A protein has these predicted regions:
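Conserved signature/switch motifs of ABC ATPase nucleotide-binding domains
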Residues: 130-133, 151
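The feature captures the beta-strand-to-loop junction immediately N-terminal to the Walker
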Residues: 37-39
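Conserved ABC transporter NBD signature motif
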Residues: 60-72
Length: 249
């Protein structure tokens, strides 16, 4: 029997005498797009950082492909709410820099070709030579997404990647993210507080309770057919009501 691609087994997180996350077990299979949905302060970003190897549970264990996670690794890429691009490098240079660290044996030509491919996938071929200061917030975040996919991680972690963007830009980037993911089928775990975003993007939605002592209170399959541009479809409306009811309790 194969191990789940990602597994958090009976993890807890405490700071001093305050328990932020009560015992929680999560399993995610390879190729799934899973959103963790919950109110502010419930610990959802803490869970994501445990999978990234940037934080560790107080008790319990976290595994990737059956191996304990003991720190960051090239098998996991992360996109934050703020892009974290290097300001002195171009859009393409930022992607190539990530590739140089993650894939040191690739030639310069190979890195250039990979960067071009992912810039094209996020619609930024025309902006390859621009530095971040000359890119809009949405364009900067597209570069961050392209950089994360370009290093070809087995697991992609998204921490509210579109939270700082306006509604129109956010929807555009959601659809571009879905397009890039569908071509790679990497395992994706995304943290969000946006119910519609979770419905548009996910195969599964894990709903967390209010803190302190948060835990996963529901594991909801998303059966809304693709494409999901219209979240006013009957199946999406029903799912939205279900998720909002869970978040209110």
């Amino acid at each position: 029997m194969t191990s789940p691609h990602v597994e958090l087994k009976e993890i807890t997180k405490s700071y001093g005498s305050t328990t932020i996350i009560a015992p929680t077990t999560i399993t995610i299979e390879e190729g799934q797009f899973v959103s963790i949905l919950g109110p502010s302060g419930c610990g959802k970003s803490t869970i994501l950082s445990m999978v990234a190897g940037l934080n560790f549970p107080t008790t319990g264990s976290v595994f990737a492909s059956g191996s304990p996670i003991t720190g960051p690794g090239p098998d996991r890429g992360m996109v934050f709410q703020h892009h974290a691009l290097l300001p002195w490098m171009t859009a393409k240079g930022n992607i190539e820099f990530g590739l140089k660290s993650a894939r040191p044996h690739d030639s310069r030509t190979e890195r250039s070709d990979i960067a071009d491919t992912y810039l094209e996938q996020v619609g930024l071929t025309h902006a390859a030579s621009r530095r971040p200061a000359r890119l809009s917030g949405g364009m900067q975040q597209r570069v961050g997404i392209a950089r994360a996919f370009a290093i070809d991680p087995e697991i992609l972690l998204l921490d509210e990647p579109f939270g700082a963007l306006d509604a129109l830009t956010r929807r555009e980037l959601q659809l571009q993210l879905l397009h890039v993911w569908e071509s790679s089928r990497r395992t994706v775990i995304m943290v969000t507080h946006d119910v519609d975003e979770a419905i548009v993007l996910s195969d599964r939605i894990l709903v967390m309770s209010h803190g302190p002592e948060s835990t996963v209170i529901a594991d909801v399959a998303v059966d809304v057919p693709h494409p999901r541009h219209d979240t006013d479809a009957d199946s999406a409306v029903e799912l939205r009501h279900q998720l909002l009811d869970l978040l209110e309790h």
